[in-house]
Amino acid sequence: MATPVVTKTAWKLQEIVAHASNVSSLVLGKASGRLLATGGDDCRVNLWSINKPNCIMSLTGHTSPVESVRLNTPEELIVAGSQSGSIRVWDLEAAKILRTLMGHKANICSLDFHPYGEFVASGSQDTNIKLWDIRRKGCVFRYRGHSQAVRCLRFSPDGKWLASAADDHTVKLWDLTAGKMMSEFPGHTGPVNVVEFHPNEYLLASGSSDRTIRFWDLEKFQVVSCIEGEPGPVRSVLFNPDGCCLYSGCQDSLRVYGWEPERCFDVVLVNWGKVADLAICNDQLIGVAFSQSNVSSYVVDLTRVTRTGTVTQDPVQANQPLTQQTPNPGVSLRRIYERPSTTCSKPQRVKHNSESERRSPSSEDDRDERESRAEIQNAEDYNEIFQPKNSISRTPPRRSEPFPAPPEDDAATVKEVSKPSPAMDVQLPQLPVPNLEVPARPSVMTSTPAPKGEPDIIPATRNEPIGLKASDFLPAVKVPQQAELVDEDAMSQIRKGHDTMFVVLTSRHKNLDTVRAVWTTGDIKTSVDSAVAINDLSVVVDLLNIVNQKASLWKLDLCTTVLPQIEKLLQSKYESYVQTGCTSLKLILQRFLPLITDILAAPPSVGVDISREERLHKCRLCFKQLKSISGLVKSKSGLSGRHGSAFRELHLLMASLD
């Protein structure tokens, strides 16, 4: 008789490279537990099917990193908020942009779809919460009350309330119909990262960076219990669908809690690090985590997890006898949510204000929607998920099969971390992954959307060179094409690269010694002139980095020499050069632009004033150079990320030049 195979309770499913740059947000579809959406610093939203290596769809249109993403309950719509404060809604079935919503003044930290009506709630770094009508492209209401960034938003199951968690250590409950705050729940001593409604009862759970989970009674508006002793900040919690327990995604573990009284039913070790989102499907809990550009998915078999009954660990009352029995989960001690009989009638009665009529101009919306695209990367998976062909419209959707659990003692290996396609310029280090998570299976290389073309700017901080050539720092020399390299030629090529780098560093050292000799005399202007005469931008950057640290070193005659070099730095492909150029230009604009404009606007004086004439000549020269740079700054102000913010700030400072 065959020995039954013992399988694992928790295991790693796969790891993929989800974006060409860092992943900044992700979310699981709660209906199926199989759809994953990721947002990245590359301004894209990518959709994935859990346990499949290929990207299904890539959504473009944002011009700054995507900070928050959320799927609606049927997994037909997705909303994404960016660092610039813009919000975009896509229809996944139609594969197109649905709405662009503008109004927040800072990055979007949290989003949620209304469970029935066509509404979206957004929370921002600007401390405001806004309720949007997707059909009317307008803000229905703005909720004010938090003093810091709003980190999480959740609609109640009946769609009447909205819970918000913020960095100001508070949880607030808002009445959508009345358009006002119902109650504030203080008690946390750190930023509140997540809130979650009980699926049936008037109960709310909140998790905080103070390592506690608090349960709130929504009838009496008071705390029910508090779970203390979490191993780290609480970032992800989820109620079981029948409401019998709460799952907390902790650092490298899953914990199962009850709340009356507070107790821990079970602890499952899962090496997922900082888990970002949880979902339940087929008695399996799916957890996803991200690090840099990698996203990892994990599975916990809930049939082998204690969810009620005997307590295995009690971090709150560990030294007290366990005499209380768990009540029947089916017997509710609180009011039950009453579902509305119609799907959209209740939310439409939301109190409106003057802001509800504010919409983006139609021409602006049309332009945004033209620039937004839904690129289907895998047509087969897309059709299977978003375009199912049921023979009869009443046929229930096909239920996903549970993931098979690997054997407990099998020397399994995880799927190989997918790597970017050859077209991708950014080389990402392969992360070490544990080898005791999933059964051995053929390694699958994933394909991710490849960015088009080389990066405009080479990052200043990186683990390895990215498209960096030492020969870029030397005069261009025509190199004849060579035939296929043999071993001797390869060694010669390696030595040639070494010689090139040696020449670069030797030249840099010599140039810096020359500038330093002049610098020690205390003549800053002559030092800068000598650096410019050397015709090596790297030396100019090193010198400006010193001058920028002490604003008092800047003089008007120094500006006339530096401004042409700043124009070159702003057009460089090296991030450090661009940063130095932006910093220097900002100092010049703040200290000298008012002086330049005042001198140029002043009427001519009577008689001959040589010093005034010299000052006027310098101001005219600086003004001409600033006008030349302003066009470059304006053209780059539409960039995303840090450079875009810096150029937009410079563009505002240079507005008086127009």
From Swiss-Prot:
Gene Ontology BP terms: cell division; microtubule severing; mitotic chromosome movement towards spindle pole; negative regulation of microtubule depolymerization; positive regulation of apoptotic process; positive regulation of microtubule depolymerization; positive regulation of neuron projection development
GO molecular function: ATPase regulator activity; dynein complex binding; microtubule binding; protein heterodimerization activity
Region annotation (Interaction with PAFAH1B1) ranges: 285-437
Intervals holding WD repeats: 18-58, 61-100, 103-142, 145-184, 187-226, 229-269
Entry keyword set: Cell cycle, Cell division, Cytoplasm, Cytoskeleton, Microtubule, Mitosis, Phosphoprotein, Repeat, WD repeat
Gene Ontology CC, one term: neuronal cell body
Start-end of Polar residues biased regions: 311-329
CDD domains registered for this protein in UniProt: WD40 (cd00200)
Mutagenesis / variant outcome for changing G607A: Abolishes localization to microtubules
Span list, region Interaction with dynein: 1-284
Result for mutant: Y574A: Disrupts KATNA1:KATNB1 interaction with ASPM; abolishes localization to microtubules minus ends; decreases ASPM localization to microtubules minus ends; no enhancement of ASPM activity in blocking microtubule minus-end growth
Localization per record: Cytoplasm; Cytoplasm, Cytoskeleton, Microtubule organizing center, Centrosome; Cytoplasm, Cytoskeleton, Spindle pole; Cytoplasm, Cytoskeleton
Modification sites for Phosphothreonine: T395
Function, in words: Participates in a complex which severs microtubules in an ATP-dependent manner. May act to target the enzymatic subunit of this complex to sites of action such as the centrosome. Microtubule severing may promote rapid reorganization of cellular microtubule arrays and the release of microtubules from the centrosome following nucleation. Microtubule release from the mitotic spindle poles may allow depolymerization of the microtubule end proximal to the spindle pole, leading to poleward microtubule flux and poleward motion of chromosome.
Protein name per UniProt: Katanin p80 WD40 repeat-containing subunit B1
Lineage: Eukaryota, Metazoa, Chordata, Craniata, Vertebrata
Gene name for this UniProt entry: Katnb1
